[in-house]
């Protein structure tokens, strides 16, 4: 084996890790949880909302922690906005109904098992989107995660980070 091959396989020098390094917060993180589903309303006006909790230290987000309540149609709005205005491939949302019930108007969407399955699917959806570097700059994502009410008449565009100002 040549000397250059041996030199290329040597380990890089690294500093020893202490407890602060090992158990401190990661350098950049974005955590989004969907939890606490609540079904509200009666009859045809009945729907389920979910709490969307975000924690981050990414400088692009104005709030480091937020918790908002969203319904399925809000996730549909976000998906449509991202498909219309961004350059990212948007993953699919979980299905709208568990199964067809020909004599039931709600199609099983208020059954606990369906609500939990949808919650998991929505959590996967939002984490895939939020994990994409280009999506993190989209104003619609920031509004979805951090503002109590979604302004559906907002002006689409990019969010300027601290370094962009």
From Swiss-Prot:
Highest taxon of source: Eukaryota
Any one GO BP annotation for this protein: protein transport
Q: Name one GO molecular function term.
A: phosphatidylinositol binding
Any idea where the PX domain is?
28-151
* UniProt-listed Pfam families: PX
Q: How does it sit in the membrane?
A: Peripheral membrane protein
Q: Which InterPro entries match?
A: PX_dom (IPR001683), PX_dom_sf (IPR036871), Sorting_Nexin (IPR051074)
Q: Where is this region: Disordered?
A: 1-20
Give the family from UniProt: Belongs to the sorting nexin family.
> What is recorded about the domains?
The PX domain mediates interaction with membranes enriched in phosphatidylinositol 3-phosphate.
- The name of this protein is Sorting nexin-12
Q: Which gene encodes it?
A: Snx12
